[in-house]
């Protein structure tokens, strides 16, 4: 009887530990476009993560579901926690590894990758990056963002076009 009680207690404890180990998804990162600038709003990421620092951001031109060309890559200084980052911006203490602003075009599909360090309460690394998909329309210098459904339709059309011989 004691053995069964101990077994049940262990299983209950194991189930509780597994429930605590569930990771949560990173928040959505809003993208803003206008006046020839594209910015990523990092405030939701900073607000919903523990002791986070943004380490690297990159943007690539996407064709279908694959990155075809990297347009911008920046390494940010330790402890960087700004609430917003402008694509192709230059920030004090950062290293811009690649910058091709002329390749950011209307009617393009893009992914922004935000790499960060977040420490849990036990000082273990948890989630380390988030990808943000966005599509531009309009005229150069007067960009507009497409809604998610239109961007998804564009990605699917590009994917199908790439499959044809």
From Swiss-Prot:
Main localization (coarse): periplasm
Annotated GO CC locations: periplasmic space
Keywords, comma-separated and alphabetical: Periplasm, Signal
Range of residues in the leader sequence: 1-21
Subcellular location: Periplasm
Role noted for this protein: Immunity protein that neutralizes the toxicity of the P.aeruginosa antibacterial toxin Tle3 in the periplasm to protect the cell from fratricide intoxication.
Loss of function: phenotype: Growth of mutants lacking this gene is affected in the presence of various P.aeruginosa attacker strains because mutants cannot resist Tle3 toxicity.
Protein name per UniProt: Type VI lipase immunity protein Tli3
Gene that produces this protein: tli3
Self-association state and partner proteins as the record states: Interacts with the Tle3 toxin.
């Amino acid at each position: 009887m004691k053995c069964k009680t101990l077994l049940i207690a262990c299983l209950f404890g194991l189930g509780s530990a597994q429930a605590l180990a569930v990771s949560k998804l990173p928040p959505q990162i809003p993208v803003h476009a206008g006046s020839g600038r594209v910015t990523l709003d990092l405030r939701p990421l900073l607000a919903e993560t523990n002791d986070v620092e943004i380490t690297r951001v990159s943007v690539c031109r996407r064709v279908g579901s694959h990155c075809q060309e990297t347009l911008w890559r920046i390494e940010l200084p330790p402890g960087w926690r700004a609430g917003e980052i402008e694509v192709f911006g230059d920030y004090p203490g950062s290293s811009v590894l690649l910058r091709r602003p002329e390749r950011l075009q209307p009617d393009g599909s893009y992914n922004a990758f935000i790499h960060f360090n977040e420490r849990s309460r036990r000082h273990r690394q948890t989630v380390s990056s988030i990808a943000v998909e966005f599509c531009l329309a309009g005229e150069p210098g007067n960009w507009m963002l497409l809604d998610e459904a239109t961007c998804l339709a564009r990605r699917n059309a590009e994917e199908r076009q790439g499959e044809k011989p």
